[in-house]
């Protein structure tokens, strides 16, 4: 915006009535663009002039608005932040251009493209504020319609992809379970055949679990177990994975910054993200002469001026890792969609279209960003950014093996609205030496306690029908019995336990699906913990 101030002739006094013959105001009066002038030297900065276009746009008469402040255009849905920015610009005597939802006299709304500028006389005195306006409702409606259409297209692609992949997995699980059932009815059991069926069914379950984690990663809803690590170390630890992914015919180069700062991310999800990038790079290299991959790490400072160049990263210090291939690259039409869930250019069965969307979601949920640079026929670079963490490196201990009989006959109340899920949890925990009872909702659970039953652990689902969720139940039971241990479970992974409308961060949680040994380990940790938080 130019620093040159708008000026009028020194004869201008601030009284618009004396300027009726001025060619400027004659032009303003006849233009089709709505315009008003206000007087900042009078109390409440009132309107002192409006042209016919403004009156037609708002439905008011000149007599109704002259001498009043412009706030009559505001209504209940007007953005207060935009109003505040306008006030600040007026206080600071600077130009402002914005879009605001305004109200006509009849109560109907319109989107107003507003430009306000101070006007000075030759002596440098502020005498007016000049505001030009434009009804842009049609443009905003068209933009909203386009966004809705795009959202519905994305939703259709997402739900179609989910249904396709889960139907395939359900086919595998159901088919092999039927084979196991048929084998159990025969007088002699082919143990190897049953074991193969069990293996394939479990493999399908694991793939389904991976699919939900990828979806949650894209939506930034997965539960991340962040710890301090160095990306250089992450690259070194995944070298065997890199070599297996690309094979001996691909040249792998690394350029790792020896002074690279640490970051705090989930190491398991980070490895999965890198694997997804490696797989896409490998597929892009098929048939290319002299295929090559380079891996680079760097420190980076993002300032306020540059943050939009880094996908809106907050100003601060970051570390980055970039994977570059000299593969086929992508046209812009594919580049712009490559991180959408279930978008894939691969043939059926070769990819789910969730790999890079998982990478994007993981980076975002970790406080960073993922950016892709590509040129068709030249290659692709995918760069991840994570905030610097000055804490020292930590090393996670491997989980200890779980004894098949780790329970000591502790009593557990299982609260789960799905009977099949509840029965499975009971069978698992019974096998580990616990005494379990099942109820299907929170009200039944409270009745159990009120009848005098005593339990060492309340194991409850988080989301349940009936008006009382798992957190509400846990808090009520803990209020009555402060020493009871509590473990929540949810299929929603991360944010249902931390959403402000549910809460519950004071309790430990185990995510579904959960392997029997993992559930047993978590139950033991909670029971042995001082306050039920492992």
Curated annotation (Swiss-Prot):
It comes from Pseudomonas savastanoi pv. phaseolicola (strain 1448A / Race 6) (Pseudomonas syringae pv. phaseolicola (strain 1448A / Race 6)). Residues 411-527 form the Response regulatory domain. The modification Phosphohistidine is found at residue 164. The modification 4-aspartylphosphate is found at residue 461. Residues 161-390 form the Histidine kinase domain. This is Blue-light-activated protein. It catalyses: ATP + protein L-histidine = ADP + protein N-phospho-L-histidine. The keyword Transferase applies. Photosensitive kinase and response regulator that is involved in increased bacterial virulence upon exposure to light. Keywords: ATP-binding, Chromophore, Flavoprotein, FMN, Kinase, Nucleotide-binding, Phosphoprotein, Photoreceptor protein, Receptor, Sensory transduction, Transferase, Virulence. It holds the Pfam family Response_reg. Residues 20-93 form the PAS domain. SMART domains: HATPase_c, HisKA, PAC, PAS, REC. Its EC number is 2.7.13.3. The modification S-4a-FMN cysteine is found at residue 70. The keyword Aminoacyl-tRNA synthetase does not apply. FMN binds covalently to cysteine after exposure to blue light and this bond is spontaneously broken in the dark. Residues 94-148 form the PAC domain. GO terms for molecular function: ATP binding; phosphorelay sensor kinase activity; photoreceptor activity.
């Amino acid at each position: 915006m130019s620093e040159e101030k708008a000026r009028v002739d020194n004869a201008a006094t601030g009284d618009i009535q004396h300027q009726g013959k001025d060619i400027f105001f004659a032009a303003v009066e006849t233009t089709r663009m709505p315009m008003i002038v206000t007087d900042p030297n009078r109390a409440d900065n009132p309107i002192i002039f409006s042209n016919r276009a403004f009156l037609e746009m708002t439905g008011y008469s000149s007599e109704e608005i002259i001498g009043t402040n412009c706030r009559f255009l505001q209504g209940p849905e007007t953005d207060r932040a935009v109003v505040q920015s306008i006030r600040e610009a007026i206080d600071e005597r600077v130009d402002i251009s914005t879009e605001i939802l305004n109200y006509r006299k009849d109560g109907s709304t319109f989107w107003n493209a507003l430009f306000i500028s101070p006007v000075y006389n030759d002596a440098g005195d502020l005498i007016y504020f000049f505001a030009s306006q434009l009804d842009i409702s049609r443009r905003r409606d068209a933009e909203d319609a386009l966004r809705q259409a795009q959202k519905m297209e994305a939703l259709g692609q997402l739900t179609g992809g989910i249904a396709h992949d889960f139907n395939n997995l359900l086919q595998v699980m159901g088919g092999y379970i039927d084979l196991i059932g048929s084998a159990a009815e025969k007088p002699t059991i082919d143990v190897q055949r049953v074991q193969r069926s069990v293996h394939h069914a479990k493999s399908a379950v694991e793939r389904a679990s991976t699919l939900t984690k990828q979806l949650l990663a894209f939506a930034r809803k997965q539960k991340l177990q962040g710890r301090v690590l160095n990306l250089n170390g992450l690259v070194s630890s995944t070298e065997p994975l890199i070599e297996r992914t690309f094979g001996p015919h691909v040249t792998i180069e690394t350029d790792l910054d020896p002074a690279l700062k640490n970051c705090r991310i989930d190491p398991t999800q980070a490895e999965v993200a890198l694997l997804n990038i490696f797989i896409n790079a490998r597929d892009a290299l098929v048939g290319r002469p002299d295929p090559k991959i380079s891996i680079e790490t760097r420190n980076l400072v993002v300032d306020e001026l540059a943050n939009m160049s880094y996908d809106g990263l907050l100003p601060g210090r970051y570390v980055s890792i970039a994977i570059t291939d000299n593969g086929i690259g992508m046209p812009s039409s594919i580049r712009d969609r490559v991180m959408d869930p279930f978008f894939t250019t691969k043939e059926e069965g070769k990819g789910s279209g969730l790999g890079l969307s998982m990478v994007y979601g993981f980076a975002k949920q970790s406080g960073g960003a993922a950016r892709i640079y590509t040129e068709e026929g030249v290659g692709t670079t995918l760069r991840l950014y994570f905030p610097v963490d000055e804490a020292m490196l930590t090393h996670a201990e491997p989980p200890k093996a779980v004894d098949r009989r780790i329970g000591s006959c502790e009593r557990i109340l299982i609260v789960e609205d799905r009977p099949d899920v509840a029965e499975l949890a009971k069978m698992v925990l019974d096998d580990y030496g616990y005494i379990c009872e099942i109820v299907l909702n929170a009200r039944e659970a409270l009745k159990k306690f009120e009848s005098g039953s005593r339990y060492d652990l309340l194991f409850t689902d988080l989301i349940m029908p009936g008006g009382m969720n798992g957190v509400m139940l846990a808090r009520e039971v803990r209020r009555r019995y402060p020493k009871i241990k509590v473990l929540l479970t949810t299929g929603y992974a991360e944010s249902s336990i931390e959403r402000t409308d549910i809460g519950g961060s004071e309790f430990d949680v185990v995510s579904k699906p959960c392997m029997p040994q993992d559930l047993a380990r978590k139950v033991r940790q909670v029971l042995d913990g001082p306050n039920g938080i492992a």
